[in-house]
Amino acid sequence: MSVLIVGSIAYDSVESPAGSVERALGGSATYGGLSCQFVQVLHEQPSTGLVGVVGEDFATEDRSILSSAGINLDGLEVAPGETFRWEGSYHGAMAEAETHATHLNVFEHFQPAVPDHWKQPSVLFCANLHPEIQRSVIEQTTPARLTMLDSMNLWINIAKPSLLDVMTAADLVIINDGEARMLSCLLYTSPSPRDH
């Protein structure tokens, strides 16, 4: 396996200044996998494998979107119940999402099991997951070149010690500027010229 991606596969309902969508295919593993496969196809590289969980309501056409992009779905688990759902909106510069509702559904008890034939990928991408789950994925694999992880403000707020721990096992951490400030506990305030 060239690239192994572990994370969420979801249905998103999103509002933005440009419009809105209901129950669109989303999730961190979905976007990571499609982006990775796009780049790999351009460079004629080997495959991307995805490990995640969906519910019985996961549409055949959405599975086809992933498989027709060349993503290997041997690690996709179908569990009883509904697929993870997220509802939110983007405003202004669209740098951060505002969450309106999160329905974990089958994702709530997701414990990824990396298939044996995928345990030595060239690149491991732990997409947005609880840091303890990211740690378990890292412990199941021995990436040859690069270990990346993605995180978000939720995990900084509720699982900061676990996040700091798993970050030590990664070569690259992906967060936005607001999350970087949260994580570092630094709030920059510009001094007023009158303060000098």
Which residue stretches match the model-derived regions?
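Conserved N-terminal subdomain of the carbohydrate kinase-like
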Residues: Y11-R23, F38-F125, E139-A144
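Histidine-anchored nucleotide/phosphate-binding helix
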Residues: T30-F38
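Short glycine/threonine-rich catalytic loop with a Thr-x-Gly-x-Asp
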Residues: A24-S28
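Structural beta-sheet core signal
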Residues: I5, G49-G52, L149
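Positively charged, low-complexity intrinsically disordered leader regions
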Residues: M1-E15
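Single conserved hydrophobic/aromatic residue that forms the stacking wall/gate
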Residues: Y188-H196
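Short beta-strand segments
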Residues: V6-G7, A101, A127, D150
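Conserved beta-alpha-beta core of the PfkB/ribokinase-like small-molecule kinase fold
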Residues: S122-Y188
